[in-house]
From Swiss-Prot:
InterPro entries in UniProt: 4-hydroxybenzoyl-CoA_TE (IPR050563), DHNA_CoA_hydrolase (IPR022829), HotDog_dom_sf (IPR029069)
Name of the protein this chain belongs to: 1,4-dihydroxy-2-naphthoyl-CoA hydrolase
Biological process according to GO: phylloquinone biosynthetic process
Keywords: Hydrolase
Amino acid sequence: MIDRFLDKRNPREWLCLKRTVRFGETDAAGVVHFLELFRWCHETWEESLEKYGIALKDIFPTNEINTSQLDIALPVVHCEANYFQPLYVGDTINIELETEKINESSFVLRFKFKKNGEQIGSTNIKHVSINPITRKKCALSKQINLWLHESSSNF
């Protein structure tokens, strides 16, 4: 359950995250492999939900909860990435997450990757809310709607 005290928090607390590039995330040239950017996006989204106060088990299937037991599923229906500079092992980056609710059943997550204050990459990932049994579009959950609303506040 989302606590009321979150209403007064700064969205920066759950939308700006930091990470260090690890060896296993690079290719033979020592440059971050392109797929890692999307993995970092999903990890950033998960961490953002947790920091905001949403339990991941309420959003994603787990070993205890399968997809059919969830109220909604949020598949990716479109994604794109832009790479402006390479990243190497040991680089520290900041990942900034911006949200945009498109309609009652879909939203876009926009990620900016920055190193030393300079943007070095970006991604856009569109999710659509569906009923996990019928696979038809449905309204976003109350939790996701609240997270999107509070995350879209200017910070």
